[in-house]
Swiss-Prot record:
Catalytic activity reported: ATP + H2O = ADP + phosphate + H(+)
Top EC class of this enzyme: hydrolase
GO BP term (any one): protein folding
GO MF entry, a single one: unfolded protein binding
Residue positions binding ATP: G37, G89, T90, T91
Phosphoprotein listed as a keyword: yes
Function according to Swiss-Prot or TrEMBL: Component of the chaperonin-containing T-complex (TRiC), a molecular chaperone complex that assists the folding of actin, tubulin and other proteins upon ATP hydrolysis. The TRiC complex mediates the folding of WRAP53/TCAB1, thereby regulating telomere maintenance. As part of the TRiC complex may play a role in the assembly of BBSome, a complex involved in ciliogenesis regulating transports vesicles to the cilia.
SUPFAM superfamilies: GroEL apical domain-like (SSF52029), GroEL equatorial domain-like (SSF48592), GroEL-intermediate domain like (SSF54849)
Location(s), subcellular: Cytoplasm, Cytosol; Cytoplasm, Cytoskeleton, Microtubule organizing center, Centrosome
Protein name: T-complex protein 1 subunit alpha
Length: 557
């Protein structure tokens, strides 16, 4: 007999669900743990259709995993959020969140209420962020461009392009500085999305290059067109310039065969008139996302205009933004009249088709509204080029964040070790139950230097103990304050001054990863009940016929 409330599913409550959630989070963290740090290893992921991805990027690994457990999904989304918000630190944010959960579960087993733990974690996170901002940040104005290059090198050190760190770091910094513009509030902005990254497999990765201007992976639509135009006026069209045909279903009854020729002529004339309206404004470069008819190409060749077809929508948007053009999906106004004005054109100093590496590319140089830059990556194969692109994206985001926040923190586990010592001392000053949670938060942060050392095949216990001793000395003894920059040297297996060595990370990466990891851990920690509904069975009659409903007594006849 069913109770007054029957749930069509499984219900898991209390300690059991909390343990399940912690195990799910720990298993996700274990997948990405070995890819952390400059000597982290790569993962090979093969999807259901056999596509192979080789990567070291935490967000990419977790995006490609098909995770079923709801708590594990929270961590996968967490890595994605960190990637979108900051661009780097995706692996460490997942590892910290899982460790916070694991330690919280231990406290719950000791009969500490989850609410007390949540309060302690929130307090510890707030205190940690305050400590970073007051004691650990280094102003980039003191260090200049070298600081940006070092931050980019630190980001790349764990990636495939880390071997040529100096070469790529300079390229990344130059690319980000090239797209700088000032917004309406007078603040400098660095839109990383406007840097076009093209991949061409072949040659070595050292033969990658930075181009000042927007590189378009297309060629001119006809051989008769000019390959170079100075003082370009660019029209960006989101429709095809092909002979207009009547829509399907339109029937025209013709009594005179000559009328058929007139209809065909009119179809051709509609497109011809559109082209004439565009060319009349002085446009000499036409970019369209659709196709261009051979008949239409003739008009462009005659007027010595460059026309490019099948341009990607993404590229068209970026070019329009850089050149000041307006993207048009139709020439018709609300009244139905077709027109094209000169104000809709974008401007650039030069548009030229060049052979770069082994491919023909169209370069749009010195655009009027904003500057643009393109990076062409070379690599042994497609897997390598894809991973280089992901590594480059992380480095570009890091440089952008350093320029915007104007501050960096030392890398190599220095921040986590300093926070661990500080929060342990802070916990002892608390007279409430939150003391235990803050102490566990401090212990959880040590997972980062620990994992870095393990991945580098070093003695993690010994290294982390030495690191903590240095940071304790820095906080206790004001005369030895400079020891707070001490982090790990993973190649030689000893602590070193990471400020002098130039191992830097953007402050935002550390602050955001702490905040995101704490919030994710709290979200999962608050769960004490899981109700998983059964999928509706096929022989379920609830969606049956009228006769079935009458027969079951659900409705009266």
């Amino acid at each position: 007999m069913e109770g007054p409330l029957s749930v069509f599913g499984e219900r898991t409550t209390g300690e059991s669900i909390r343990s399940q959630n912690v195990m799910a989070a720990a298993s996700i963290a274990n997948i990405v743990k070995s890819s952390l740090g400059p000597v982290g290893l790569d993962k090979m992921l093969v999807d259901d259709i056999g596509d192979v991805t080789i990567t070291n990027d935490g967000a990419t690994i977790l995006k490609l995993l098909e995770v079923e457990h709801p708590a594990a999904k929270v961590l996968c989304e967490l890595a994605d959020l960190q990637d979108k918000e900051v661009g780097d630190g995706t692996t460490s944010v997942v590892i910290i969140a899982a460790e916070l959960l694991k330690n919280a579960d231990e406290l719950v087993k000791q009969k500490i209420h989850p609410t007390s733990i949540i309060g302690g974690y929130r307090l510890a996170c707030k205190e940690a962020v305050r400590y970073i901002n007051e004691n650990l940040i280094i102003n980039t104005d003191e260090l200049g461009k070298d600081c940006l290059i070092n931050a980019a090198k630190t980001s790349m050190s764990s990636k495939i392009i880390g071997i040529d760190g100096d070469f790529f770091a300079n390229m990344v910094v130059d690319a980000v500085l090239a797209v700088k513009y000032t917004d309406v509030k007078g603040q400098p902005r660095y839109p990383v999305n406007s840097i076009n990254v093209l991949k061409a497999h072949g040659r070595s990765q050292k033969e990658s290059m930075l181009i000042n201007g927007y590189a378009l992976n297309c060629v001119v639509a006809s051989q008769g067109m000019p390959k170079r135009i100075v003082n370009a006026k660019i029209a960006c069209l989101d429709f095809s310039l092909q002979k207009t045909k009547m829509k399907l279903g339109v029937q025209v009854v013709i009594t005179d065969p000559e009328k058929l020729d007139q209809i065909r002529k009119r179809e051709a004339d509609i497109t011809k008139e559109r082209i004439q309206k565009i060319l009349a404004t002085g446009a000499n470069v036409i970019l369209t996302t659709g196709g261009i008819d051979d008949m239409c190409l003739k008009y462009f060749v005659e007027s010595m205009t460059i026309a490019v077809r099948r341009v990607l929508k993404r590229d068209l948007k970026r070019i329009a933004k850089a050149s000041g053009a307006t993207i048009l999906s139709t020439l018709a106004s609300l009244e139905g009249e077709e027109s094209f004005e000169a104000s809709m054109l974008g401007q650039a100093e030069e548009v030229v088709q060049e052979r770069i590496c082994d491919d023909e590319l169209i370069l749009i140089k010195n655009t009027k509204a904003r500057t643009s830059a393109s990076i062409i990556l070379r690599g042994a194969n497609d897997f390598m080029c894809d991973e280089m692109e992901r590594s480059l994206h992380d480095a570009l985001c890091v440089v952008k964040r350093v320029l915007e926040s104007k501050s960096v923190v030392p890398g190599g586990g220095a921040v986590e070790a300093a926070l661990s010592i500080y929060l342990e001392n802070y916990a002892t000053s608390m007279g409430s139950r939150e003391q235990l949670a803050i102490a566990e938060f401090a212990r959880s942060l040590l997972i980062i230097p620990n994992t870095l050392a393990v991945n580098a095949a070093q003695d993690s216990t010994d290294l982390v103990a030495k690191l903590r001793a240095f940071h304790n000395e820095a906080q206790v003894n004001p005369e030895r304050k400079n020891l707070k920059w001490i982090g790990l040297d993973l190649v030689n297996g000893k602590p070193r001054d990471n400020r002098q060595t130039g191992v830097f990370e953007p402050t935002m990466v550390k602050v955001k990863s702490l905040k995101f990891a704490t919030e994710a851990a709290i979200t999962i920690l608050r769960i004490d009940d899981l109700i998983k509904l059964h999928p509706e069975s096929k022989d379920d009659k609830r969606g049956g016929t009228y006769e079935d409903a009458v027969h079951s007594g659900a409705i009266e006849d």
